[in-house]
Amino acid sequence: MRSTQEIKATLQSAKPLLMARYPIESLALFGSFARGEATEQSDVDILVEFNGSIGWQFLTLADELETLLGLKVDLVSRKGVKPRYFEYIQKDLIYV
């Protein structure tokens, strides 16, 4: 199983290329990997904030992140998170 540090390092290395391909403002880990509670069955929860329209490229980005990390990714748009849920995940965020 990959560690949180390995995932963070992989995302940091790929971030410039991802930002060139997609209108990404920021990326952050949250959930079990961010809390250090991940198991073999855990997916990688990633919150992404965009600085432009993403449309169908959202799905392409999710697939690219899964390939990059070799793990199932749950990609969540910051604009798609309701305020009450954001309060819950905000404390877990690890920005890359």
What do the PLM-derived regions correspond to, one by one?
Residues 1-26, 35-40, 51-96:
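Catalytic core of pol beta-like nucleotidyltransferases
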Residues 29:
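Conserved histidines in hydrophobic membrane contexts and catalytic metal-binding motifs
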Residues 47-49:
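Short hydrophobic/aromatic beta-strand micro-patches
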